Amino acid sequence: LLSRMQRKPTWNDRFRLDVLRLQDMAMKTLDPLEYSEMAELALLAGFPTEAKKAMDEGYAAGVMGKGNNAGPHKALRDKANKQAADDAKNIASGEASAMKSKDGTGLVNLGYAYVTMDQFDKGISLMEKGIAKGGLKRTDESKLRLAIAYAKAGRKADAIKAFEGLKGND
């Protein structure tokens, strides 16, 4: 279903990271390209802990760090590890400014960052506050990420309800 969706002419590539997140939850193991793509996209999106986890999963599954890609995989893993450590040290400092912001974007992003750090309750609470605050450029994308957060937290009923409520056109 996820790969069929990406072949539609209306597919928007900005959802690629979300698709990889869903694949990661649904499948036992991704292929090396998907792990590295997920890590790269997560770094670009500002979620280094998610990137670190993707690389760690790939290495644990035994599909990363081999052959001609061993060097690039190690470099990406090192970059993700460094940025994740920095993010863990500095994440709390962003909370006050996200709360004061006119729109909920900062709260949604900060909340998802906490979710990637397995601080599900705190992260989901911030995401819900951000969505309720409004002013989001892409509300359905924020709701999609909240649904993913619910699923990662094991809140199946909330995840299903959130997924069912999505009405995006992309």
Question: In which residue ranges do the predicted regions lie?
Answer:
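Helix-turn-helix repeat elements of alpha-solenoid scaffolds
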Residues: 7-17, 78-88, 115-124
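Long, contiguous interaction/recruitment modules in multidomain scaffold/adaptor proteins
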Residues: 40, 44-87
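C-terminal soluble interaction/assembly domains
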Residues: 102-170
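Solenoid-like repeat scaffolds
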Residues: 8, 21-30, 43-45, 59-65, ...
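Residue at a conserved register position within TPR or TPR-like alpha-solenoid repeats
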Residues: 5-6, 42, 114, 150
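Eukaryotic tandem repeat interaction scaffolds
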Residues: 81-106
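Generic helix N-cap/helix-start motif at coil->alpha-helix transitions
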Residues: 1-2, 12-16, 29-37, 47-50, ...
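Alpha-helical repeat scaffolds
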Residues: 1-2, 12-25, 50-59, 88-96, ...
